[in-house]
Amino acid sequence: MEDKSLVTLKKKTFEVSKFSNLGAIELFVDGRRKRPKYFHRRRETVLNHVGGKKSEHKLDVFDQRDYKMIKSYAFLKIVGVQLVVTSHLPADTPGFIQIDLLDSRLTEKRKRGKTIQRFKARACDNCSVAQYKVEYSISTQENVLDVWKVGCISEGVPVCDGTYPFSIEVSLIWVATDSTRRLNVEELNSSDYIEGDFTDQEVFGEFMSLKQVEMKTIEAKYDGPYRPATTRPKSLLSSEDVKRASNKKNSS
């Protein structure tokens, strides 16, 4: 049976926060380190005029203030993602826009995909919203300020005055923790995570759609079709590359 004082604390915290308390949840404090056992926060950022080969737009969902609070933990985990795509194109506009949430550390050499979450919307949709419950972890020894970026692909969409009139709003719910175990629904709904019951889609949606949080807007100008950056090892140079290099050397 759950301790009555804990029930009271959960109820009080839930009512006071109204899903808008984005600071640390100090329930069970690690006595040795004098810090919250878990740190739970939601952040939001907006990209305007997206669509182009500048695929890895920095999200800026973390700042130095956040880093100081999480660096003593072992892991940073994304547990929720919301993507909102806003289009200002006419209803008969063809094509699609594809949004990729990327891990900028992952490369071809790691034999892993960079895409954490992918979302596709019709170009003519006035507003498309998608919410995902995810489980993605990185070590806090990584450069967490620059890890997550957004990639955009516009397929068959006409360019208007050199730009695509799309805006993307990206929201992340993340948790700082020392746990090496995979977070599950029971853990997210435990007393260490007083931000709502994420098994309830309505509550999850209410939390993700908050407007009290400060948003950062980034102008991402169109610069050609989106092409994920790829590099070829020197061992895979084609005969044309070798010939071109040889001619350049002989001419000099």
Curated annotation (Swiss-Prot):
Keyword set includes RNA-binding: yes
Pfam family, one: MP
Signal peptide: none
Cited InterPro entries: Viral_movement
Gene Ontology molecular-function annotations: DNA binding; RNA binding
Annotated stretches, region: Disordered: 222-252
Family statement: Belongs to the tobamovirus movement protein family.
Function text: Transports viral genome to neighboring plant cells directly through plasmosdesmata, without any budding. The movement protein allows efficient cell to cell propagation, by bypassing the host cell wall barrier. Displays RNA-binding activity.
Name under which the protein is recorded: Movement protein
Lineage, highest ranks first: Viruses, Riboviria, Orthornavirae, Kitrinoviricota, Alsuviricetes
